[in-house]
Design a protein with these regions (language model features):
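Conserved C-terminal beta-signal and adjacent last beta-strands/turns
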Residues: 6-9, 186, 234, 433, ...
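Extracytoplasmic beta-strand/coil segments of soluble accessory domains associated
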Residues: 64, 68-111
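Short acidic/polar hinge/loop motifs at secondary-structure boundaries
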Residues: 111-138
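Periplasmic-side early beta-strands and strand-to-turn transitions of outer-membrane beta-barrels
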Residues: 142-143, 155-157, 162-172, 176, ...
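Surface-exposed extracellular loop regions of Gram-negative outer-membrane beta-barrel proteins
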Residues: 250, 289-293, 345-354, 397-411, ...
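Outer-membrane beta-barrel signature, preferentially recognizing the C-terminal barrel domain
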Residues: 259-277, 310-318, 363-371, 416-431, ...
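Signature of Gram-negative outer-membrane beta-barrel scaffolds
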Residues: 334-437, 452
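Gram-negative outer-membrane beta-barrel transporters
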Residues: 381-387, 495-507, 523-607, 641
Length: 671
């Protein structure tokens, strides 16, 4: 990739920092590897935290499944990162409509993780046991990189040195000849530490196609992927440190037919400076080099299949950074001011094939976009009352967009250049948190936000089954307005209950709109609005050795599109009910057991509600047996009762299914 030299240059920085850092005084210097502390007004916006114990002990071992603990979290489809097309892994919250791009801002140590071209999240590269905590905030976001958080934010924090064993490794074997291997070391170095880890998982995959629809070309959803992560933290003074992270990943998958292969890969690097002195500082720079390819196979008869489209190369680059300052303004205020920028550039190359296997068209499309924002927020504590509020001003540009097409011999047939566009977008949020006592707090918040259409939505068409969805270079940004109110109750030590009522309106929502005269033809368009309102409930508690956590979301979403056939209907891929509950038995020593129940209500495949995906209820379980000397025997089970999970319904009657019963046995070692 063309930015590899810069990635390697960034990779050298932590080594130099570690080598040149002055020998620390252990009595004065504490390296945490964390960011700045959360402002006191953060709870006003409501959030759910997933702790490290849960992250390290799930049935699937995959972050997107664990995020399902937060009811209302969803990807575009119900598949996980072993059987989904990578470009469909957009993350969203609050049933704001199915969209393969992420409406939720996903951050890892402050770095936006969305693919620069597609907007999807590389979930397979986000290994849960490398993380310390995940905090999910539903609703509009602000602060650094707040542009893009129209459905909330998912903040992932890397595990700190005190959470990481010096050496850890695990090996699992699962159903359908699946293997999962991981290892990591985290030695102290100078006054800081380095963490190097890697994971490789592969499997023959399950049949996503129902038995009565399989043909000669049908193939299971095989997958093979790996990722490595290097993180280094070094002290610069008693109150400041520098943090580096580099991630490499590669992922190959097959979906539905032999030869229907997809590939995604990435090289990410970031460097972050944290100062916890009188003037607190959080400065960050990052670079991402990503690529994607995908082959579309059609099976016109039960005995034949052919390649119809080869999306052979989609290189993209993301560059960005931020600086946040917290000046000393007194003990009652936490003021944050700063700026951030994100630049995305990408190209799409694809070849179209005829029924005879001859290239009939070669397409090349792409463009650039940039968002630069300035923000200020303050939290003011007045006894039991916390007031919080902030504003953002973002300058966005969409430029150099084009779509070119040539015939099979290379003669140009189409050359379209799209006009550059730019504008300012202003956002704000405000919240209040009032503690009625030690056991109860009430809160309320209002917010606005926006999201630019991705390069993928603007310039790249895609095909799923017999349905082709066209891009739309004229798309405008989505804009959110929202209100919510809630209560948090802690009736006893270790027990917490929370309830939130919300109203969100997403204006100019980007949706895949079906052509009324051809159900196999869709186009991305801005619709008037999607309105989502509902209730979210969470609960957690520990009694003796038993731990219970639960979450439920009711989301009543409708599309406002006067004059359109889908006006008043539920947006695609938006279930009305979602729930999750985990019951665990975790004594301080000895064996441990946990079981997780998840429910997702009926949702529609399309905007016209012609194809309904039935509801699904699944049960997962994990059992751990310590064997001594740092070795633990682990058994995991996904979808234990083998529930049939529908992930897609095609206009031709074709069906895709999600993960069936999957069993794992393995060992984990840490020292």
């Amino acid at each position: 990739m063309k930015y590899l030299p810069l990635s390697l240059a960034l990779a050298a920085i932590p080594t130099v920092a570690l080598a040149n850092a002055e020998a620390p005084d252990p009595a004065r210097i504490v390296v945490t590897g964390e960011g700045l502390a959360l402002p006191p007004g953060t709870p006003a916006y409501g959030s759910v935290a997933i702790d490290r114990d849960r992250l390290a002990n799930s049935a699937s071992g995959r972050i997107e499944s664990i995020l399902g603990d937060v009811a209302g979290f969803q990807q575009f489809r119900r598949s996980d990162s072993r059987s989904a097309n990578p470009s469909a892994q957009g993350a969203t919250l609050r049933a704001l409509g199915g969209n393969a791009s992420s409406r939720t801002l996903v951050l890892l140590d402050g770095v936006p993780m969305a693919d620069p071209f597609f907007g999807y999240i590389p979930f397979s590269a986000l290994v849960p046991d490398r993380l310390s905590v995940v905090r999910v905030t539903r609703g509009g976001g602000l602060g650094a990189f707040g542009a893009g958080a129209v459905a909330g934010a998912i903040e992932l924090a890397s595990a700190t040195r005190d959470q990481l064993p010096t050496f850890a490794a695990s090996a699992f074997y699962g159903s359908r000849d699946a293997t999962e291997l991981s290892a990591g070391i985290a030695p102290d170095l100078g006054g800081g530490y380095v963490s190097l880890s890697g994971r490789w998982d592969r499997g023959g995959g399950f049949q996503t196609t129902p038995k009565d629809q399989r043909v000669a070309a049908t193939a299971p959803a095989a997958y093979d992927g790996w990722s490595t992560n290097l993180r280094a933290v070094a002290p610069l003074s008693a109150t400041s440190e520098i943090q580096f992270r580099g991630t490499l990943f590669h992922d190959d998958r097959t979906l539905r037919f032999k030869g229907a292969d997809s590939m995604s890969e990435g090289q990410d690097a970031s460097i972050r400076f944290i100062s916890r002195g009188a003037w607190q500082v959080d400065a960050l720079a990052y670079i991402q080099a990503r690529n994607f390819s995908n082959i579309v196979i059609v099976a016109p008869t039960p005995t034949t299949s052919r390649k119809s489209l080869d999306q052979r190369n989609t290189p993209s680059t993301g560059i960005g950074g931020k600086i946040e300052l917290r000046p000393p303004v007194g003990p009652d205020h936490v003021l944050r001011v700063g700026a951030d920028t994100r630049i995305a550039t990408g190209d799409m190359y694809e070849d179209v094939y005829s029924a005879a296997g001859v290239v009939t068209a070669r397409r090349h499309a792409g463009g650039d976009q940039m968002t630069t924002g300035f923000f200020a927020e303050d939290d003011w504590t007045i006894g039991s009352l916390v007031l919080t509020g902030g504003v953002r001003a973002d300058r966005w540009t969409i430029s150099d967009g084009f779509f070119r097409q040539a015939n099979g011999t290379g003669v140009g047939t189409l050359n379209t250049a799209f006009a550059d566009r730019s504008d300012w977008q202003f956002s704000g949020r405000a919240g209040v948190l009032y503690h009625l006592g030690d056991a109860i707090a009430v809160r309320g918040a209002g917010y606005t936000g926006f999201r630019l259409p991705t390069l993928n939505e603007l310039y790249r068409p895609f095909v799923v089954g017999s349905v082709r969805t066209e891009a739309n270079a004229a798309l405008t940004p989505e804009k959110l307005k929202g209100l919510e109110a809630g209560v948090d109750i802690n009736p006893a030590t270790g027990v917490s209950l929370s309830a939130t009522a919300f109203y969100n309106k997403l204006d100019d929502a980007i949706a895949n709109v079906t052509d009324p005269s051809n159900l196999n033809a869709r186009q991305r368009r801005n619709v008037d609005a999607i309105v989502a309102k509902g209730m979210e409930l969470t609960a957690s508690g520990r009694i003796a050795d038993f731990l219970l956590s639960a979450s439920y979301a009711y989301s009543h979403s409708t599309v406002h599109a006067p004059g359109m056939r889908f006006d008043g209907l539920t947006p695609a891929q938006s279930p009305r009910h979602a729930a999750s509950a985990t019951l665990a038995w975790e004594p301080e020593q000895g064996p441990a057991l946990s079981a997780t129940l998840r429910y997702v209500a009926k949702q529609y495949e399309d905007d016209l509600q012609a194809y309904a995906l039935p509801d699904a209820l699944t049960v997962d379980a994990v059992a751990r047996l310590p064997l001594g000397h740092g070795v633990t025997l682990i058994a995991r089970g996904e979808n234990l009762f083998d529930e049939k999970i529908y992930t897609r319904l095609g206009t031709d009657g074709s069906i895709d299914l999600g993960t069936p019963r999957t069993l794992w046995i393995g060992v984990r070692f840490s020292r």
